[in-house]
């Protein structure tokens, strides 16, 4: 397998992991879950979770399932930093990765959340 194929496969695995860990868009928190899912699923290279897993392996880890919550959390924290960077009080960006920023689609209050 070449590098690009490996990278694509890992991104797909991380996207599946995030879909499993993120909340369902239903119930009383539906709008919050929609904003969270929109933000996290806006794209990206998913390098941070990949690097975390590789460091774990480098240090002798062999049970990848143990790392899944940490990988998902790391990607969510990174996404949070991007959402906050886009807010009007910071860069006031309207688009990220070709899509409306979270605060433009859901309102500034959801961008802060």
Task: Place the predicted regions along the sequence by residue.
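Mg2+-dependent prenyl diphosphate-binding active-site environment of isoprenoid biosynthetic enzymes
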Residues: 12-113
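Double-stranded RNA-binding/processing signature
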Residues: 4-7
């Amino acid at each position: 397998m070449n590098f690009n194929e490996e990278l694509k496969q890992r991104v797909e695995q991380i996207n599946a992991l995030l879909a499993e860990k993120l909340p369902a868009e239903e119930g009383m928190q539906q709008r919050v879950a929609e904003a969270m899912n929109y933000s996290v699923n806006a794209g990206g290279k998913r390098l941070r979770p990949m690097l975390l897993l590789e460091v774990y392996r480098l240090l002798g880890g062999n049970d990848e399932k143990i790392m899944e919550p940490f990988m998902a959390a790391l990607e969510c924290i990174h996404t949070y930093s991007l959402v906050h960077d886009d807010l009007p009080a910071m860069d006031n960006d309207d688009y990220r990765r070709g899509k409306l920023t979270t605060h433009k689609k859901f309102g500034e209050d959801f961008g802060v959340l």
